């Protein structure tokens, strides 16, 4: 173990349909990208993402599927011993949100009670198809939800901070310095971000629809 290696480490699995931006998202963290390792037996890349908190550094070993989810589900070996997860969909593609319950089912079948964040990526694109009011799956399953835009770094740290607070058991945990991120490839429109934050707040205060399906 390297001298300044964080003592606190967690396996984080990143799941969701192919093309939703999972790899783009994890590659934003520059040291994680520089130090990633390829696990040939499972066909995954593991990115070590370190975050500095007021309780000391923590490391997420983020398992990224390297695109194999396009050929069907992932093997159990991918999920085994995961301590937390991010499920990602693309807000410009309804089918990727429709598949979220399948990813969640596979995940909790192997990892029963781990903290999970649902992320809707690509919110920088104006032509949004999956609106805040339609995103209800996380409320039914007690997950956390964030709009994100990997290419603009918008809300990049939010899923990791929420998971850290759950895993460490400290709701007041904070990140004390921001990780080095790749420069934004695009700018997130501040007025659009404000509108989406408002829409999510309104949606969170609206009663869930009665139907019992997962969409």
From Swiss-Prot:
Positions marked as site (Essential for GTP hydrolysis): 68
Binding site for GTP: 17-24, 35-41, 67, 121-124, 149-151
Known role: GTPase involved in nucleocytoplasmic transport, participating both to the import and the export from the nucleus of proteins and RNAs. Switches between a cytoplasmic GDP- and a nuclear GTP-bound state by nucleotide exchange and GTP hydrolysis. Nuclear import receptors such as importin beta bind their substrates only in the absence of GTP-bound RAN and release them upon direct interaction with GTP-bound RAN, while export receptors behave in the opposite way.
A Pfam family this chain is assigned to: Ras
Reaction equations catalysed: GTP + H2O = GDP + phosphate + H(+)
Keywords recorded for this protein, A-Z: Cytoplasm, GTP-binding, Hydrolase, Magnesium, Metal-binding, Nucleotide-binding, Nucleus, Protein transport, Transport
Annotated GO CC locations: cytosol; nuclear envelope; nucleus
PROSITE patterns: RAN
Domain Small GTPase Ran-type: start-end pairs: 6-170
Names of the cofactor(s): Mg(2+)
Switch-II: annotated span: 67-83
Gene3D superfamilies: P-loop containing nucleotide triphosphate hydrolases (3.40.50.300)
Renumbered residue ranges of the record's region Switch-I: 36-44
Cofactor details (free text): Mg(2+) interacts primarily with the phosphate groups of the bound guanine nucleotide.
Gene this protein is translated from: ran
A molecular-function term among this protein's GO annotations: GTPase activity
Self-association state and partner proteins as the record states: Monomer. Interacts with RANGAP1, which promotes RAN-mediated GTP hydrolysis. Interacts with KPNB1. Interaction with KPNB1 inhibits RANGAP1-mediated stimulation of GTPase activity. Interacts with RCC1 which promotes the exchange of RAN-bound GDP by GTP. Interaction with KPNB1 inhibits RCC1-mediated exchange of RAN-bound GDP by GTP. Interacts (GTP-bound form) with TNPO1; the interaction is direct. Interacts (GTP-bound form) with TNPO3; the interaction is direct. Interacts with KPNB1 and with TNPO1; both inhibit RAN GTPase activity.
Family: Belongs to the small GTPase superfamily. Ran family.
GO biological process, one term: mitotic sister chromatid segregation
Database matches in SUPFAM superfamilies: P-loop containing nucleoside triphosphate hydrolases (SSF52540)
Annotated protein name in UniProt: GTP-binding nuclear protein Ran
Enzyme Commission identifier(s): 3.6.5.-
Domain of life: Eukaryota
Subcellular location: Nucleus; Nucleus envelope; Cytoplasm, Cytosol; Cytoplasm
Interaction with RANBP1: annotated span: 210-215
């Amino acid at each position: 173990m390297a001298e300044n290696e964080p003592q606190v480490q967690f396996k984080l699995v990143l799941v969701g349909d192919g093309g939703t931006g999972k790899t783009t998202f994890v590659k934003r963290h520059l040291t994680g990208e520089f130090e990633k390792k390829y696990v040939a037996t499972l066909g995954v890349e593991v990115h070590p993402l370190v975050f500095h908190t007021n309780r000391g550094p923590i490391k997420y070993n983020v398992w990224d599927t390297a695109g194999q989810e396009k050929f069907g589900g992932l093997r159990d070996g991918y999920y085994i011993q995961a301590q937390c997860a991010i499920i990602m969909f693309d807000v410009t593609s309804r089918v990727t949100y429709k598949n979220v319950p399948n990813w969640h089912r596979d995940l909790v079948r192997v990892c029963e009670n781990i903290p999970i964040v649902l992320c809707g990526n690509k919110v920088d694109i104006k032509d949004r198809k999956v609106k805040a009011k339609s995103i209800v799956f996380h409320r039914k399953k007690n997950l956390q939800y964030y709009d994100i835009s990997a290419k603009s770094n918008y809300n990049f740290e939010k899923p990791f901070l929420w998971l850290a607070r759950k895993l460490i058991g400290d709701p007041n945990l904070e990140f004390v310095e921001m990780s080095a991120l790749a420069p934004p490839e695009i700018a997130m429109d501040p007025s659009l971000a404000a509108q989406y934050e408002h829409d999510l707040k309104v949606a969170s205060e609206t009663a869930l629809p009665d139907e019992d399906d997962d969409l």
